[in-house]
């Protein structure tokens, strides 16, 4: 709202005068006129071939098709465990010093 120096025919809105003689313009939001309905004359018809030409379609030629994917290979098989231990029986010799028993006897006496 405010005072405008434009001529009255260029103003959009409502013009009011205040008590001190100034003219004020209250700006309004211009509304659009409703749209007019479009009527086709009854002599104009659209044939099916023209209608099909206007709508996009998916290409169906063999050259544009996505190639078929071959089947996936089989999953890898689990490897056999390596033979870490041998099945050959080995005799183990134990070392037994003659004074080994005396060491344990002395500790037991404390």
From Swiss-Prot:
GO molecular function, one term: protein kinase inhibitor activity
Protein name: Cyclin-dependent protein kinase inhibitor SMR8
Naturally occurring in which organism (per UniProt): Arabidopsis thaliana (Mouse-ear cress)
Subunit architecture: Interacts with CDKA-1 and D-type cyclins.
Tissue specificity as recorded in UniProt: Expressed in the root vascular tissue.
Keyword Cell cycle among record annotations: yes
InterPro entries: SMR (IPR040389)
Keyword Membrane among record annotations: no
